[in-house]
Amino acid sequence: LATCPFFYVAAQYANHDMLVAGLITAAILALAIAVERPPQVQLGWLLAGSLACALATLAKGLIGFVLPVLVIVPWLLAQGRWRQLVKLLHPLGVLVFLLVAAPWFVVTQMSYPAFFDYFFVEQHFRRFALSSFNNVAPFWFFIVLLPALTLPWSVWLPRALKYAWSTRDARIALYGWWVIAIVGFFSFPSSKITGYVLPAAAPWCALLTLLIARGNTRLWQWVMGAAALVCVLIVAVIAWQAPKSNRAAALVLAARIAPADSVVMVDEYFYDLPFYARLNRPVIIASDWADPALPTRDNWRKELFDATRFAPALGREVLRPLNALDSLLCGTGAVWFVVVPKQAQRVAGLAGITRVFSNANTELWRAPAHACP
């Protein structure tokens, strides 16, 4: 796993995919260890698995416990170990899960009465069933993607499959079913993102490792060295290309902004700018909020648009139409527009505006306030 490109490509994204994949992996392994001495269930490992399921649920919703259940339950039933399955429902395990996961959901629902419908119904069931949401890909997308992202080790896949099919080792069966369950689960929805299949990375690599370790030692050691070098190069390229920091623009803004001034981000959200500029109130985001395609794209616009359901007054204040930028100049303070260079023409014609800062990633423009009729 540590020498697979998949691991490093996925790690560059600032989202919860790696976190929930790690927690789901920890949950499945803990539950598998809990039942490794049939017919007993080791309570300590069961509680660890319950805790990991709860944390995974907090990280990214119901898949935090649905996927571990989808892996462990059929695996035990296929071996006729239903007594252990019943013991996994130990009251202490259920209690740990509820104590960790439930309070946040309860408090959020009490604060925002529409939360349960949005989070559980829309973000799970409706989104799972939609055929046109976000990155639409064919059913076989992950079946092709997983071997591609785990090269060079996936070259051993045919032999690994043959070995897994011929053995009756429960551990091999667990890893095999684990991969099938995760890949199958995320293959049914039409929306597919690379990070979805991360919970299958560990068992996939474990299957390949068990076979490779039985083969030519010199060969796999040479491949490991080459793979490690490739991964280092991937990290180097990402580190060289990826930085798109807005820190320089933010420092200029922080030095010159007045208390009465406002900040407007134009058709883009500059995540790090409020942090570096130490802004203490919400920025205004100008975009096409009436776009009918907005609900079908999983991006920053949809996140902010969805948030207006729970804070409509604040939404009306900070989410402004892109075609009414001049109206934002009405007030007592100056207005600072933050744009990507290719969008600079949207603000260049505003009354009295001047460009204060520019680099390859960001431009900062200042327009004085004026009285409006």
Please provide the spans of the model-predicted regions.
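Signature aromatic-anchored transmembrane alpha helix within multi-pass, membrane-resident enzymes
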Residues: I212-V235
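Short glycine/proline- and acidic residue-enriched helix-loop micro-motifs
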Residues: A129-L130, F142, L233-A236, D306-F310
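Active-site phosphate/pyrophosphate- and oxyanion-stabilizing loops and adjacent acidic/basic residues
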Residues: C53, L251, Y271
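Luminal/periplasmic acceptor-recognition loop/helix of membrane-associated glycosyltransferases
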Residues: S245-E268, L279-P373
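Hydrophobic alpha-helical transmembrane segments in integral membrane proteins
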Residues: G195, V232-A255
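Membrane-integral, polyisoprenol-dependent glycosyltransferases
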Residues: L1-R218, L279, A360
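Short, flexible loop segments at the rims of nucleotide/cofactor-binding pockets, characterized by
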Residues: V41, S132, I238-P243, P312-V318
